[in-house]
Each structure stands twice: as C-alpha cells, then as structure tokens.
Amino acid sequence: MNDSNKLYDLAQCFIPGGVNSPVRAFQGVDGKPFFVEKAGGAYLYDVDGRAYIDYVGSWGPMILGHRHPVICDALTKAIENGISFGAPTEIEVKMAQLLTQLMPSMDMVRMVNSGTEATMSAIRLARGFTKRDKIIKFEGCYHGHSDCLLVKAGSGALTLGQADSPGVPKDFAQHTLICTYNDLSSVRKNLEDYPKEVAAIIVEPVAGNMNCILPSENFLPGLRQLCDEFGALLIMDEVMTGFRVALGGAQEYYNIKPDLTCLGKIIGGGMPVAAFGGRKEVMSILAPLGPVYQAETLSGHPLGMAAGFACLTELARPGLHKKLTELTTLLVLNLKKAAQEHNIPLIINHLGGMFGFFFTDAKTVTCYEDVKKCNIERFKRFFYFMLKEGIYFAPSAFEAGFMSLAHGVEEIEKTISSARRCFAQSRF
C-alpha cells in the first residue's frame, strides 16, 4: 500500500469521506485520491514522490502557477506584521480599489472568505434591495453550498449524482426557480409566471461547474435585457471566470454589465478570499450603511489581502492573458487533433485559461442535459491513463480544467503525447 492510500484510509476515520470537499474523493472517477506533499510551477508532487502536470490548479486559483515568488514574497512580508487583527487595514482598502478598477461594474466591494459566502450575501442583498424573495438560477450551475442554491446544482453535487441536497427545507427551495442554461425562453416564462417576485438572476457567465459550457451569442445580453424589463438584478458569479477568461472577467469579454458580481479563487492568490460588489445604489444598503446584514470574523484578512493584491497586480501586466489564451488554445487544438487521428469523438470548449472535455458524438454541448449525455466511462478511462502518465486533470467529467501561466510548451507537448497514446488504445 502506498502512502496516499494509507493517508486516505486514516483520513476516513476522522474526516467524512476522507476529504474536506467531496470532489477531491475521486468518486467521480471511481477511485481513490492521491495526497499532495508540495507543488511548484505547473507541477504537483504527491507523498509517494510522483510528479504531475497540474491542470486543476487548486480548482482555479493558481493562475500564476504554484509557489509563485510574487505571492510568496507578499505573504512573507505580511506575516511579519501579524496574522489577523479584526480591524481595518490599508491593504484591504488597496485591494478594494484595485478590484473596482479591474471590474468597472463594481462601484463598491465587500470582502468575504469563500465563493459560497459571496453568492449567499449577494442574493440576500438583492432580495433586500428589490424587496422580493425569488431567484432564478440555471440547472447544472453551482454557486456554492448555501441552502437556496443547492437546487439543481453543478460541481460536486453532479459528480455525486445529487443535484439537490437533503437538509434544504422545501420552504427555502420554493423560492429558487430553475431555468435551462442558454435558453432565454425558459427565463422569460419564469419571470412572467412570477411577476414582481424575482429578486435576481444569478448566472455563471461561463458555466464551469458542469464542465465548461460557453454562453450562446444572445444569452448574456438577453439576461441583462430581461432583468431590466422585469425589475430583477443580474448577478454574475465570476468566482471561476473572474480574471481568468480576461483581466476584467467574462463581463469584460462579453461586454455585459451586471448589477452585482461575485468573485473568488484567483483574487486570493491561493488564500481563502472572495468578494461581492456592484452598483453603489445596491451596495449602500449593506450594513453598516443600510439594513441588509453581513459580517465575518476573518473577512479582509491581511494575509489573504496581501496575496490577492500581489496576484492581481501581477496579472494586470500587459500580455499575460494573451499568453494564457495562447497556451490553452495550443493544448485544445492539439488534443482535438489527437482525438480525430484515432476517430475519438471529442468536443473541447475553452475560453481564456479554462477548458472542458466532452466525449460525445453530439455537435455541440450547450446545457446540463447535453452534458449528462456524454460518455462518462470514456472520460474515466482517459483520466486514469493520463494520471498514470503524470498528467492531472479534474477527477470529474463535470469540472472545468485550468491552464496556468507556469505551463509551457514542454508541459503541453508531454500532455499531447500522452493523450495520443491513450487514444490509440483499442479499448478506449
């Protein structure tokens, strides 16, 4: 038995399922997880001494690569002043200023510690502002694990076959209306069925929690128009897409201005940091200015602010997102070519530094129902072949992949070479 298996057995004695987030348990690929000892650049190293080219990137935050010197230096300097104060600091003001500069739709911003807290707080704020109770979300989209959002959710809930979670009262769930991603008619129907009851539409502008689903040309503009027509707020969950598909997120790329934006992952540079922000008119009813309450002990944590400010400052350097897109495109085009050479039906959606695999004979994959029809067993075989070759993709057919700026041509060429060997197998 290797050290990873020993640690997993021990972990299951003290941690439910042996992991602190369900998708890490490898249940989506019917296996056991490896345990990480360290990381650097584009690589993870497990406790058994194996190295992996990492296309998971801590589920998105590590856009600069692991152990980037800019972030490490910022953390080292920050910790010399103390760990946590529970009082305002200059670095959180600088961080807020930077966020509002990079995301022009955000006049004001409130720092929190996780994407779940960001979306939960944004929805409470939207309800308080509009004095309405219902929200619209999309089947297969994941916005964290707060009760009202664990209805037809994506990410780990899909991996475990639990699109809804026990423990969510029906009284909560009844205020969450479900629509089909990329289908504006389903949105209009719900808005017409519940006039003046919908507080907000929350959407992943690129749906990264049912793999990687891109919005159709009219989808996001259509949502903006419908929100304006029916008096609802548009909340963009850019926890995953923020600073990854473009410096200003998907809202910059698609030229859409939401009322509220939720951020996470990259903004902490690997530390647990998230935020929500938007129009001053809406944000001004948040406590202590207004009646909508939100508070946390560790929000604006000085170490997280230092790491996040360093990460975003580095990302703002000219040319980095162009490079990230070029690296992702190089990987995607060559993986598609390798699949075609062996008559493997494979769709790869991608934008900026994120991508997703769909083993399917379909021409397009545009919504949750399309994702469910893909060949999950083929994905599992692909995942394990690549893992044995030292290539780590997300251990679930419902999770997006992530490129980092630490990846280079060498890592991509090794990935393509391994994929060709995988696709050449007769049993694949």
From Swiss-Prot:
UniProt signal peptide: none
Record-linked HAMAP family: HemL_aminotrans_3
Enzyme category, top tier: isomerase
PROSITE patterns attached to this UniProt entry: AA_TRANSFER_CLASS_3
UniProt GO molecular function: glutamate-1-semialdehyde 2,1-aminomutase activity; pyridoxal phosphate binding; transaminase activity
Oligomer and partners: Homodimer.
The organism of origin for this protein: Hamiltonella defensa subsp. Acyrthosiphon pisum (strain 5AT)
EC number, as in UniProt: 5.4.3.8
Gene it is expressed from: hemL
Pfam families in UniProt: Aminotran_3
Protein name listed in UniProt: Glutamate-1-semialdehyde 2,1-aminomutase
Listed NCBIfam families: hemL, PRK00062.1
